[in-house]
Amino acid sequence: MEALVYTFLLVSTLGIIFFAIFFREPPKVPTKKLK
């Protein structure tokens, strides 16, 4: 159970950091699928 908890926390942290950086900076790569 501990492995699942640590994995979930790691993925959540990376996801939050990724979205924070992605929304703070304008995407340099043209993303036509998102919009």
UniProtKB/Swiss-Prot annotation:
Keywords: Chloroplast, Membrane, Photosynthesis, Photosystem II, Plastid, Thylakoid, Transmembrane, Transmembrane helix. GO terms for cellular component: chloroplast thylakoid membrane; photosystem II reaction center. Found at the monomer-monomer interface of the photosystem II (PS II) dimer, plays a role in assembly and dimerization of PSII. PSII is a light-driven water plastoquinone oxidoreductase, using light energy to abstract electrons from H(2)O, generating a proton gradient subsequently used for ATP formation. One of its GO terms (biological process) is photosynthesis. The gene is psbT. The chain crosses the membrane at residues 3-23. The keyword Membrane applies. Belongs to the PsbT family. PSII is composed of 1 copy each of membrane proteins PsbA, PsbB, PsbC, PsbD, PsbE, PsbF, PsbH, PsbI, PsbJ, PsbK, PsbL, PsbM, PsbT, PsbY, PsbZ, Psb30/Ycf12, at least 3 peripheral proteins of the oxygen-evolving complex and a large number of cofactors. It forms dimeric complexes. This is Photosystem II reaction center protein T. It is a single-pass membrane protein.
